[in-house]
A protein has these predicted regions:
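Sensory input modules used in signal transduction
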Residues: 111-113, 127
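Short N-terminal helix-loop-first-beta-strand/juxtamembrane motif that initiates sensory/input modules
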Residues: 14, 18-21, 52-70, 108, ...
């Protein structure tokens, strides 16, 4: 049956994507709750830098305001810095799915796996609204995560997620 109706069966790739989604979701939600992100200033940019250094599978980490204007970003691999710098501060992301969905729903959004135009690697983009103390959306944080690198670290990340829940 699987041979003739493969859509009815979960593939290894589907399983890997689910795992990646779960792990990435834990990380981005935790980061989005950080109060430093709300001011869009030097504290926000410093927090993005330190977070991306902590998780080297992050390819690109970025913060926008509610209009989709890029406020700060962290590029983890120096080899890609020049390519990503084509997206300057103030770049308009307002028409991108990863920005629009959290603004419309107020919830985290996970995109399907795709090939990065900057690195050629398979990535998933996870985005989440950043809210103030009254739960008003003040911005959106997004992260492009290299699928291969995330899966290599999956066991350690699962342990970290369980520890955070306790």
């Amino acid at each position: 049956v699987q041979r003739y109706m493969p859509e009815l069966f979960e593939t290894e790739f589907d399983h890997m994507k689910e795992l990646a989604d779960e792990l990435a979701a834990h990380l981005i939600v935790r980061l989005a709750q950080n109060a430093d992100l709300r001011d869009f200033g030097k504290h926000a940019c410093a927090r993005l830098d330190s977070f991306s250094r902590e998780y080297p599978f992050i390819q690109y980490l970025y913060l926008t305001d509610t209009k989709g204007s890029l406020k700060c970003a962290a590029i983890t691999d120096p080899a890609y810095r020049e390519k990503y710098e084509a997206l300057p501060i103030g770049f308009d992301f307002s028409q991108r799915e990863w920005f629009k969905m959290p603004m419309q729903t107020g919830d985290m959004h996970i995109m399907d796996v795709y090939q990065s135009q900057f690195t050629g690697k398979l990535v998933i983009t996870v985005s989440c609204p950043v809210t103030d103390d009254d739960d008003n959306i003040v911005g959106v944080i997004g992260v492009d995560i290299q699928l291969e690198q995330l899966l290599k670290r999956s066991q350690a990340l699962q342990q970290e997620a369980r520890a955070a829940e306790d």
